[in-house]
């Protein structure tokens, strides 16, 4: 038997207020069609599909009236690829991603990001679109104390897309992979996911160690593989321990060690190369591998 949903349940799924759904039903005729005896009308599978399409079209820039008309007149759900190809302005992409994150629409976010990365590359997508969305989400949480789940959801969706991009490398130009890690107890790893994906576009292969990488893991990888470059990320000051680059084992040829993240500061890091942005990190690593 088909599960029927209340207006509150559908509102949660779409990331809108129940009052908004009632307005859409009243103004545009896009609402619940199923009815259980002795209860309010409830939303069935087809109703939810139409509302999901309407929500995505609104996120993509359509007016609610146009989106409702399109959703009601289309027999099958429009492919996401067609919806996300309609953007020409970067600010529209930022707004769409932000709204899709609020709506927790994973498929829309992934499709839009894949399309954007295919058009502009990881570095431009990161700097022009993704970072602004993260800033918007972060500011909203700081101001209201709500929405921390949106940041986590969006970050994990981003990581999936970046891992997908990084896995597409087939013929790396570097026989010895670059080493990439978030050091110590550093839980933040989104930036190094972006870096690994951006390097993959240049056919530069990485050994990705991820978050909370202990020194022993770095030490073992350096001794085994003698990487041409090592990128160490620290978002927080308490995780930016200089021993992570000072005590690395000596290997030949010596690797290019780069530091990323706002955690690295002070005189201990003065002689190290710090990377101000993703593009700079990619260029430095490309030089280190001889690209």
Give names to the regions the model predicted.
Residues 13, 18-170:
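Long amphipathic alpha-helical segments
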Residues 6, 19-20, 52, 194, ...:
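Short Gly/charged-rich anion-binding patches and loops
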Residues 145-291:
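C-terminal regulatory/effector modules of DNA-binding transcriptional regulators
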Residues 10:
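Hydrophobic adenine-recognition pocket in adenosine-nucleotide-binding enzymes
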Residues 1-5:
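A detector for short, charged/polar N-terminal pre-domain segments
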């Amino acid at each position: 038997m088909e599960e029927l949903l209340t207006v509150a349940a559908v509102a949660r799924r779409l990331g809108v207020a129940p009052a908004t759904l009632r307005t859409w039903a009243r103004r545009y005729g896009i609402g619940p069609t199923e009815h259980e005896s002795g209860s309010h009308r409830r939303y069935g599978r087809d109703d939810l599909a139409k509302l999901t399409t309407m929500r995505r079209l609104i996120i993509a820039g359509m007016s609610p009236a146009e989106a409702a008309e399109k959703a009601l007149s289309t027999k099958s759900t429009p492919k996401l690829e067609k919806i996300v190809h309609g953007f020409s302005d970067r600010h529209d992409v930022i707004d769409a991603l932000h709204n899709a994150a609020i709506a927790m629409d994973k498929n829309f976010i992934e499709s839009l990001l894949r399309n954007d990365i295919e058009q502009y590359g990881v570095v431009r997508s990161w700097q022009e679109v993704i970072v602004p969305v993260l800033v918007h989400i972060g500011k909203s949480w700081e101001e209201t104390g709500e929405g921390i789940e949106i940041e986590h959801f969006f970050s994990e969706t981003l990581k999936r897309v970046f891992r997908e991009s990084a896995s597409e490398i087939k013929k790396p130009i570097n026989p010895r992979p670059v080493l990439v890690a978030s050091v110590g107890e550093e839980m933040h790893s989104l930036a190094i996911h972006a870096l690994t994906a951006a390097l993959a576009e240049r056919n530069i292969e990485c050994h990705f160690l991820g978050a909370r990488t202990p020194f022993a893991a770095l030490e073992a990888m350096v001794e085994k593989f003698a990487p041409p470059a090592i990128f160490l990320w620290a978002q927080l000051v308490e995780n930016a321990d200089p021993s992570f680059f000072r005590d690395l084992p000596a290997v030949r040829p010596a690797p290019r060690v780069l530091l990323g993240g706002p955690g690295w500061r002070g005189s201990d890091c003065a002689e190290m190369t710090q990377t101000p942005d993703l593009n700079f990190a990619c260029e430095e690593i490309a030089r280190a591998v001889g690209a």
